[in-house]
Structure formats: structure tokens, C-alpha cells
Amino acid sequence: MFDVAIIGAGVVGTLTARELTRYKLSVCLLEKENDVACGASKANSGIIHGGFDPEPGTLKAKLNAKGVPLLYKAARELNVPCKNNGSMVLAFGKEEDAVIDELYARGIKNGIKGMDILSGTEARRLESNLSDKVTKALLVTNAGIICPYALTIAAAGNAMDNGAELRTNYEVTAIVRAEDGFRVCSADGRQITARYLVNCAGGFADKIAEIAGDKFFEIIPRAGEYMLLDKSEGETVSHTIFQVPTAHGKGILVTPTADGNLLLGPTAERVNTPENTETT
């Protein structure tokens, strides 16, 4: 029997395993794909978000603020490509100017330091390729960029060096209460037992919760498409550039990547399953 079984070997699951293996615990990582970082952890913007956006008082706000320095620390320890380049949220007109003020106030409530509100002229001094139509910007100096799949792979390797076991092609189909813990069954008939379970299943976390008899939320999956430009364009901007956020998310961003490319996107199209990775 393992002390802890972690379902999902994405960036959250592998970093959780890495942290738990600092202690005298037996840890098992269960992944339904044939390797780590095969879900959202290999297909995202690679942004270390500054923490100004979450609703103050929520768990997300608390963990974002605490998580930023921890993520930079993990990147240094694991030698993962990462840069504290800062971010800017741009406003175009009076209505969006007011949103910038709201985001700044929200960031202050969340305990985020190193923020500043810039005029359009001040923003263009930092980023010469910004549009003349930019009227105001929120500068967030603690934000950054990281290679998410490199982080996931490195965290998994470190956890395994510390004694964690990784079991791939392990699609969880049943979770049964057992004596002193849980029995976790896979589609191909394998089983493990663990005293505690941690659900890190990403886009499938609601399905795992339902299997465990703890259905209290639903994930509505969205797929995003990006344009990845050549490294010759990587210095077009130095900060991660956001629009003001909407109800659907942070919108289209423009950012250098940790590997020196320029990334544009993502879109946010609703799909019927997190496994739908078709492009249009």
C-alpha cells in the first residue's frame, strides 16, 4: 500500500509528487497516457501569472500569490527554462481604463507587490511596438514565463529520484473504499491501494471526482489555438502582453517564450471533451 496516490502526471501532479517525496512517504503517480505532460501541461501559454486577477479572498487568489515565488524557486532547482519578464495588461479607451484600475485594486487586496499603472506613453517607452491606441496599462513585475512541459518532466524525474513510482497507461476507472484507504483500478485491470488520493487529473478532474463519489463540480472544456513564431520574432516584446480580461478568460496574449520564440493566442472554443485537440 502506498501512502499517497496522485492521479494525473501533469505539472500539478508531478510537482505535488516532488513535494511529497521530501518526506518519508511512499508515493505513486498514475497517468492515463504513455508519458507525463501529455495533457494541458504540454499545451498552454507557459505563463507565471502575477496574481492580480483572481477574486480577492478566494483560494485561487491565495495560492496564486504564494505560488509565484515557489514556482521560480522550483525552476531554479530543476534547471528549467524560466524568466521573470513581467507582464502588461493593455487598455484601449476609457471603459478599459477603468478595468485597469479595478485590476490594480484587486492585486493590492491579493497582496501582490511590484504593480504600477502606466499611461499609454509610459507603456510604449517600455514596449516600443505597442499600438498608439493603448491608453493605459497595468505593469506586473513578478509575472514570468516558463517551459511547462520541461517543468513537468523535471519534476517527475526528481520525484522518481526521491522514490516515487510512475505508472503510465493507467486510466482510472474505479475508486473503491478499502481498509485504511482506497483501491484504485485501471482500465486494463491493474490495481493499487493508497491511504490518501490526490486528484490532479486536469481537464478530467471532475470525472475522477465523480468516480470517487465526490461529484461537486463540472469542468466545461475549451480548446485554444496558438501561433508560434520563429525566434527571429522573439524580441518583438519583452513583457507578456494581455488584453483586459473578459468572462471567458484573459483573452489573446502576445508573449516571448522561455525558449526565445514569440507566442500569440490562445483562442477559446468550447469542445465536447478535453481530449479534442483538433485544429481549425
Predicted feature descriptions by range:
Residues 12, 35, 204:
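Conserved Rossmann-like nucleotide-cofactor binding loop
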Residues 18-19, 69, 78-83, 199-280:
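Active-site substrate-recognition segment that forms the wall
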